[in-house]
């Protein structure tokens, strides 16, 4: 049985696609080894995966003296760990999903002449992936017009989309004509602080206007804001569920008519897979502003709506929600556009693995 290393860390956006591919590869008879870092360890709780998992202790590089020295020591230690992992497991192929956690594994893969594939979830190629373009067998991407991709490597590009976990591979049947309207608020794997005030204040305006909808809110909030957000919805007499992370996120999508969310890679792949109409508010300081490009890719396809954080206010958000609540035909057509964007990314990426596996 051939071993495949899947590596990615830092955020759920790098981890969850690796898990999704791991599920597909296991079904094809591969031995899967998932490598991530301590920042992603919390996302593995309450999930039961049968493949091996290794958690690396990675730290970001600081500009201050002692912290910078410590960071370099940790990076060196990670490279040694990477050497041991590659040497002892002899993977046939490495698939890297971004984040600087990939570096120690890819470097050792190059050292041992193990082929590797890069996967970019965002519409802008990340720094870690750019570092290893020259040596990669293939560069798999979500968007055909991915930015920051040097023309000399365009021949390596394969459009696969971003894999999503099995639990998220279905299309819900939503009744957009229902007067029971559920709104899903998600800030990505790390939550979003601005939503903790923006959304409740928009809902306050919604409650005070004339309509005949029963509104339910499912809100993923930053942990320290949970009590505040709950209190706001309670005061408004709005049925709500608030948590810092939903392990059963598929159920939340399934029962929601509209989402308000960031535009990270994982979120984008999930709303496409589940055909979830969404108002996208890109994180303004995301690396290379990739979330804005992600959101525009959705909006340009009329598969969602993009409102930049610099312009959004509770009143603007309220008006958008209110308009969409009263426009079931528009929500249904948006859902249809998302259906048209769906591709079987897990299968396509696994096919690339099959192609480049060492025989």
UniProtKB/Swiss-Prot annotation:
It catalyses: di-trans,octa-cis-undecaprenyl diphospho-N-acetyl-alpha-D-muramoyl-L-alanyl-D-glutamyl-meso-2,6-diaminopimeloyl-D-alanyl-D-alanine + UDP-N-acetyl-alpha-D-glucosamine = di-trans,octa-cis-undecaprenyl diphospho-[N-acetyl-alpha-D-glucosaminyl-(1->4)]-N-acetyl-alpha-D-muramoyl-L-alanyl-D-glutamyl-meso-2,6-diaminopimeloyl-D-alanyl-D-alanine + UDP + H(+). GO terms for cellular component: plasma membrane. Its EC number is 2.4.1.227. One of its GO terms (molecular function) is undecaprenyldiphospho-muramoylpentapeptide beta-N-acetylglucosaminyltransferase activity. Keywords: Cell cycle, Cell division, Cell inner membrane, Cell membrane, Cell shape, Cell wall biogenesis/degradation, Glycosyltransferase, Membrane, Peptidoglycan synthesis, Transferase. Pfam families: Glyco_tran_28_C, Glyco_transf_28. It is a peripheral membrane protein. Its main location: membrane. Pathway: Cell wall biogenesis; peptidoglycan biosynthesis. It is an enzyme of class 2 (transferase). GO terms for biological process: carbohydrate metabolic process; cell division; cell wall organization; lipid glycosylation; peptidoglycan biosynthetic process; regulation of cell shape. It comes from the Bacteria. PANTHER family: GLYCOSYLTRANSFERASE, UDP-N-ACETYLGLUCOSAMINE--N-ACETYLMURAMYL-(PENTAPEPTIDE) PYROPHOSPHORYL-UNDECAPRENOL N-ACETYLGLUCOSAMINE TRANSFERASE 1. Belongs to the glycosyltransferase 28 family. MurG subfamily. Cell wall formation. Catalyzes the transfer of a GlcNAc subunit on undecaprenyl-pyrophosphoryl-MurNAc-pentapeptide (lipid intermediate I) to form undecaprenyl-pyrophosphoryl-MurNAc-(pentapeptide)GlcNAc (lipid intermediate II). This is UDP-N-acetylglucosamine--N-acetylmuramyl-(pentapeptide) pyrophosphoryl-undecaprenol N-acetylglucosamine transferase. The gene is murG.
